Amino acid sequence: MAAKDKFAQRKNAGAIGGMMRTRVKERTKKMSSKTRRNYIRACNAFDVWRKGQGLSNKAVAKAPSKCVKQWQDALTEAGYSPSTIHTYIAGVCCGLGISMAGMTRAGTSADKRKSLGKSARAEKALERPENAEVVRFQRMVGGRRAALQRLKGGDLVRDESGEWCIQFLRDKGGKDQLQRIAPENLTAVQSYFKDKGPDELIFPQPIDKNLDLHGLRAEHARAEYERYAAICSTPKGRATMRAQLWRRFKNPRLGCKAWLTAKAKGDRAGMRRAERAFANEMADGQYHLQRANRATAELRGRPVSYDRLALCCVSVFALSHWRNEVTVKHYLL
């Protein structure tokens, strides 16, 4: 910690949250506004957490590194991805004026790293007999690495529309999510949960780090698009899927975060904004790729337009994303 740092010299640091935000603003003048906002958001989150833990201003000032490590452990336990934790820790370390040394990532997020694609390691990993069950399951479900590793026997459930799903607790961002199972895959998926206790891990052994799970998740997303496009090819099918999407949108635990937050605050205008945005995602018509995405699709022989409603079904029910743009760019291209 810098010797001239006023914060470090104080025995009682006062309002740590405010001081952290002030320091971030001073030290990020040459950084992008997005980085500054992320750092300030991280400081706010840390301040809320430490108050909930009963950590006083003085306790944090006396042992800032120890407190940040405790918060890092709490974020990991909550299911945040390594890259998200890294961003949070960077902001708080900046705010507290301490080094990030010793606070390295606990691994690499499968969804943030570059896909291994057709590399030799990935091909060999797919062919290994010991990986066969994970690969087969991933092609039917399309989960994230950390979520698959935590999957338990009690995580095969039905959603608000009565459809069978895999429940991923504390998935990306610490959120609980449901991903639907295609009817033709239900029996095979159920076999993984047979004779498993509610708290027994489905995959107790560490999943091979060379397995391109993101690539398999993308393969699953493309298969699900074809399935939902067939369902949405009739007026009855479109009406059914829209009704189910709205039910998920308003689910008290798994629904749209923006809408649920606005509802909790009694913000009717915010609720309407979220509803309009979601209605636009599943509007009739085609989602046409533009510029770089279109060029990439043409290069890879992929479609350059998608049915918006079917695409929204993939985003929400197969990937738990909510945004068609993310689904197309990261999974369908």
Where are the model-predicted features located?
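N-terminal DNA-binding module of tyrosine recombinases/phage integrases
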Residues: 1-29
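Basic, Lys/Arg- and aromatic-enriched nucleic-acid-binding interface segment
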Residues: 117-145, 275, 298-299, 306-309
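Short, charged phosphate-coordinating catalytic segments
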Residues: 138-162, 319-330
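Conserved tyrosine-mediated DNA breakage-rejoining catalytic core shared by Y-recombinases
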Residues: 151-188
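Acidic, serine/threonine- and proline-enriched intrinsically disordered linkers and terminal tails
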Residues: 233-302
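Short, basic/aromatic-rich helical patch in the C-terminal catalytic core of site-specific tyrosine
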Residues: 148, 216-229, 315-316
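N-terminal core-binding DNA-recognition domain of tyrosine recombinases/integrases
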Residues: 20-110
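Short functional hotspots where side chains directly engage DNA or cofactors
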Residues: 164-169, 282-333
